[in-house]
Structure formats: structure tokens, C-alpha cells
Amino acid sequence: MPTITVIVPTLNEVENIDLLLKRVLSTRQSCSIDFDILFVDSASTDGTCDRVLDWQEREPVHLLRLDTNMGLAGAVIAGARYTSSKYILVMDADLSHPPEVIPKLLRPLLEGTDDMVIGSRYVEGGSIPDWPFSRKLFSRIATLPALIFCGVKDPLAGFFAVERRKLTELSDSVPGFKIGLAILAEYGKDLRVTEIPIEFRDRDFGESKMNYWVVFDYLKQLLSLVFKRVGRKG
């Protein structure tokens, strides 16, 4: 089994599966890094699982079906516990994260120079070309509270690579979408982190999962991290 598994959480992403896998597998073929791809599906109803199973017959692609929607964080943790790879790379299914950057996120882990590598929108060279100024401003403001728990510029990024045990040791109750923030907060300054610039693109197909519940879960996560930090100091 490969040392690396790319985990892709899905919920009704059938329109993106083929496009994503063509680019991910092309990247895999062109680089010297071997990895497999694990889709963790949260009870999709649009044929996402059937599409993944079609690919599973001929490529290093696997499917883990969850009975309920556990949220992105829960899906990623479930996927990390399902596989036995040493390293995990997490990315979205909607092609907002460029698959061509996968080798850049993995090499520092394999070389032992970093513990976590983040595909960042906010370091020099990173960009969000599809977003209007108002949305970029809102994203920056939303990022500010998370900076309390870490020293990276894009702590809310969902595109990152990390040692698997950093995920499996997290609590099952991590809320919402910001699994990367949970890792950064849990391991703190002991974690060697590098940010790699990426061009973050909006999805072309399917429906965005961003809604008021996502914002609520993020606020709940921030409060949980605050209480946890206060408890440690106490």
C-alpha cells in the first residue's frame, strides 16, 4: 500500500469526480510520488458513489461510505482511521484546490523537513482570482480569530498534507469544516508548518457547501478551542 493517501470528502459531487480524478491521476503519473485516493462520502444521493466505484475498478481509487453526514472534519478523521498510510493529503472535490500542487505539499513531509504543509491562498504567490473584493475581505476577517491559535497566514485552508496520526489523535467531535485549524491548534508551536502558494478557484459544477450552518460550526469550533486553551492554562 502507498505511504500516502489523498482523502477527498464528498457530498453530492458527481459532476466533479471525473474532472478531479483526471487531473489528480495525471499529477500522480507525472511525479515520482506514489499515492492512492480515498473518497469519503457522506451519504450522497446524486450518484457520486457509483461514479467513484467506476474509477475504483481500474485506478488506485477507493471509497469509504458513511451512513450519515458527519461534516467535513468528521469525514476526514474517519478516512484517516480507515487507511493505514503514513501521510494524508486532504483536498476538496470541487477543484477549488489545484491537484497539480499535490507534489509540492507532499515532498517536505517525505523529506522530513515539515510536519504539515498547507496550500495557502494568502502567502506571496497565492491568489483567489474568482472572488470579489467583498468576499476576500470577509474571508480575511474570518481568519483573524483563528490566528490566535497558530502562526500561519491561512489557518482555514482545507488543502493540506500531514502525518496521519495527527488526524487520528483528534477528537471525534471536531465540528464543521476547519479540520486544518483543529490540527494547528492541537499541536501548536511544536508543529513545523510550511505554506505553499496556490490559486484557489471557485467551483464550476455542483452546489457550494458554504451556508449559515458552516459559519455557525466555525464559531462553535473557535469557542471550543478557546475553552480548551483556557483549560490547559488552568
Range-by-range predicted roles:
Residues 3-5, 36, 182:
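Cell-envelope/extracellular polymer assembly enzymes that use nucleotide-activated donors
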Residues 41-50, 95:
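A conserved acidic beta->alpha catalytic loop
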Residues 13-17, 44, 98:
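Donor nucleotide-sugar binding loop of glycosyltransferases
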Residues 66-82, 87, 99-177, 203-216, ...:
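Acceptor/aglycone-binding surface of glycosyltransferases and processive sugar-polymer synthases
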Residues 35-38, 49-82:
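Conserved donor nucleotide-binding strand/loop of the catalytic core
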Residues 172-175, 184-201:
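Catalytic donor-sugar/metal-binding loop of nucleotide-sugar-dependent glycosyltransferases
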Residues 1-26:
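N-proximal low-complexity "stem/linker" segments adjacent to membrane-targeting elements
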